[in-house]
Every structure is written in structure tokens, then in C-alpha cells.
UniProtKB/Swiss-Prot annotation:
This is Transcription termination/antitermination protein NusG. Belongs to the NusG family. Residues 133-161 form the KOW domain. One of its GO terms (cellular component) is cytosol. It comes from Haemophilus influenzae (strain ATCC 51907 / DSM 11121 / KW20 / Rd).
Length: 185
């Protein structure tokens, strides 16, 4: 069998895992694959995440957020052996799609969409606190601390906002960093 034939048989499947255990399920599955020497029947095992930046107490903090909490993506050839291997992993509830005995892969388009989203997120992290023009914010740091204002423009590349702060009865446009404001709930 040629390498091309082997690769073309692999499709992406979605596993449902206990929420909060996605990474452990992915790690355990990779270990099982290696122990059973079935690497040729499996491709990637992914927990789709994106890096988000949030401001906590005025400091920027990066963290990871799962796209699909409770799910793990597996690229694999579907047969009795691989099915049983995956089902034997602790905290795996089953496959999504198809029937319990004959799971259905996700479409190539769906897989490509997810993989492209993962690739885009390695370039630049998203901000957990997304701001939108017209939104009310409170300035927490700097000379305008404790003033309220309205978001006029948002620049995610630079992590800055243009906020119209009301001072002395006039709206004054001020450029601030994300860490200098908080949303008014």
C-alpha cells in the first residue's frame, strides 16, 4: 500500500470527552496509539484552542480558551481496531455523528475551517475583552481614571481604544490601552 493511499483513508472525527478533561483525553489517546503501535492509522489528535489576552488588575495575561469545550478532534482511519482503541480511553463518551457503532467523519470543509481557525490564532492572540464602538467603559488607570466614556474606535492590533470621555461638559477623545479600561456592566 502506498503512503498516499494510507493518508487518503484518514478522516477527521469528533470525540465527546468529559468537560475539562479534553487535554488529558488527547494525551492518553496519543499514548494508547503509541503503545499499540497504531501510528500509521492515526494522524493528529487535537483539542482546538485559541490564545486570548485578558486584562486582570491592569496587567495583560494570556490564556488558552477551547473552541469546542468537551470535544477532541481525531484524524484516523475508522476500523474495528481503531474504534475500540478510541472507545477504551478513559473519559471518552463516544463519537459525535453517525451511529454509536458506525461514527461519521466531519466533512473536509468543516475540518479545513477548524484547522484554518487554529492556524490564524497562532499568529495573533484574540482579546478576551472585546470592545465595540458605542460601548460604555470606565477608565481605571492614568490621568482619566474613574471617568466614564464611550468607545469610538478599537485597534486590536495595537491593543488600544479611542474613548470619548465626558469632562467639564464636553466629550474629549482619549487614546487608551485595553488595560486602562473596564466594561461597565
Amino acid at each position: 500500500m502506498t503512503e498516499e493511499t494510507t493518508v487518503s483513508k484518514k478522516r477527521w472525527y469528533v470525540l465527546q470527552a468529559f468537560s475539562g478533561f479534553e487535554s488529558r483525553v488527547a494525551l492518553t489517546l496519543r499514548e494508547y496509539i503509541k503503545q499499540q503501535q497504531m501510528e500509521d492509522q492515526f494522524g493528529e489528535v487535537l483539542v482546538p484552542t485559541e490564545e486570548v489576552v485578558e486584562n486582570v488588575a491592569g496587567k495583560r495575561r494570556k490564556s488558552e480558551r477551547k473552541f469546542f469545550p468537551g470535544y477532541v478532534l481525531v484524524e484516523m482511519e475508522m476500523n474495528d481496531e481503531t474504534w475500540h482503541l478510541v472507545k477504551s480511553v478513559p473519559r471518552v463518551m463516544g463519537f459525535i455523528g453517525g451511529t454509536p457503532d458506525k461514527p461519521a467523519p466531519i466533512s473536509k470543509r468543516e475540518a479545513d475551517t477548524i484547522l484554518n481557525r487554529l492556524e490564524q490564532n497562532t499568529d495573533k492572540p484574540r482579546h478576551r475583552n472585546e470592545y465595540h464602538p458605542g460601548e460604555e467603559v470606565r477608565v481605571t488607570e492614568g490621568p482619566f481614571a474613574d471617568f466614564n466614556g464611550t468607545v469610538e474606535e478599537v485597534d486590536y492590533e495595537k491593543g488600544r481604544l479611542k474613548v470619548s470621555v465626558s469632562m467639564f461638559g464636553r466629550a474629549t477623545p482619549v487614546e487608551l490601552e485595553f488595560g486602562q479600561v473596564e466594561k461597565i456592566h
